[in-house]
Amino acid sequence: MARFTLPRDLYHGEGSLAELKNLKGKKAVVVVGGGSMKRFGFLQKVEDYLKEAGMEVALFEGVEPDPSVETVMKGAKLMQEFGPDWIVAIGGGSPIDAAKAMWAFYEYPDTKFEDLITPFNFPTLRTKAKFCAIPSTSGTATEVTAFSVITDYHKGIKYPLADFNITPDVAIVDPELAETMPQKLTANTGMDAMTHAIEAYVSTLHCDYTDPLALHAIKMIHTYLVKSYNGDKEARARMHNAQCLAGMAFSNALLGIVHSMAHKTGAAFSTGHIPHGCANAIYLPYVIKYNAKDPVAAERYAEIARRMGLEGTCQQALINSLCEKIDEFNVRLNIPKTLKDFGIQEEEFKEKVAKIAELAVGDACTGSNPRAIDPANMEKLLTCTDYGTEVDF
């Protein structure tokens, strides 16, 4: 038996933010990030619509990129004091991810963060509040997923939290919010979405329900990502939809080792944080070459290439074309090809790679990767992504 879970309601299209005024409740906590939603007037619209719905509103502002355990606990404390029956998160993946974790600690104040790390081990939610997610970036798709990523900066580890309980009740996918994304964010989030769709399609848990979503998302991203990066308004709107479709796919099919590697390297190096989408973009072609040694995965990668209209007279040629296309995207989006190009220092990489490999193998996303991997091969794969060497194992 398998399960397929989505938000109960998804409102999409220009102006769909106004659906907030139709929510039924008494109190709402709005969780938001660094200030762009306030600067562009969207936060005020959210507050106004919720008040029009008859709700008292409290704000939790300042969620940082890659939210920390400490931020989650502060937000949960505000919720415990205010007592909302709606949690509304607006912004990129970070405030929505943070709000999902806050939700668990609001409803179960005695829960420890360590209790939530085990996949699909959350307590039953919605005893106090429902959840509405409003994305402003076109990548994470956390508005429709059962996932959240929280960082423990003391340990230098990103923890993917996974449970169908944290799939939002309502998602509002309004393309007006995505029009404000800067180019670099458009690039990173767009390649995050592409990675979601590709990993979902080759996952060991893919099914008839997830495959069409993943393939259509890939086709849309292939068509619209570079145009969106260059500021095309229609392409921005289509990318906002495409990333959401990719999220529906991976929330139910799960992911693979591209994400395992990104989770465990994002906060690992002293030279600076690697943005999640950027890490995914770097690792994706290397992982495709590793996974394509599995015959089932190889055929599914070839099918992706066919759907994208790429050239290739045989399966291997199609897989090569897919990897070349991803490399081309990264060049056009100004994303580095290797960790070394990103700026990771060689000595620190060598010092930490064995431990990172061990942690990546233990990541929640590794279990649904189409080809098994052990710490030794993970270390070799990470080394390829640092030096740009061929994956021949």
Predicted regions and their residues:
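ATP/NTP phosphate-donor binding region
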Residues: M1-W86, L339-K340
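Carboxylate- and glycine-rich phosphate/diphosphate-binding segment that chelates Mg2+/Mn2+
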Residues: F147-A253, A376
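Glycine-rich phosphate/pyrophosphate-binding beta-alpha loops
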Residues: G139, C244-N280, D363-S368
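Gly/Pro-rich interdomain helix-loop hinge
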Residues: A268-T271, G277-E351, V391-D392
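Short, amphipathic C-terminal "tail helix"
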Residues: E348-F393
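Flexible, glycine/charged-enriched surface loops at secondary-structure junctions
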Residues: T204-L213, K227-R238, A253-V258, I274-G277, ...
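Glycine/threonine-rich beta-strand-loop-alpha-helix active-site module
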Residues: E70-E176
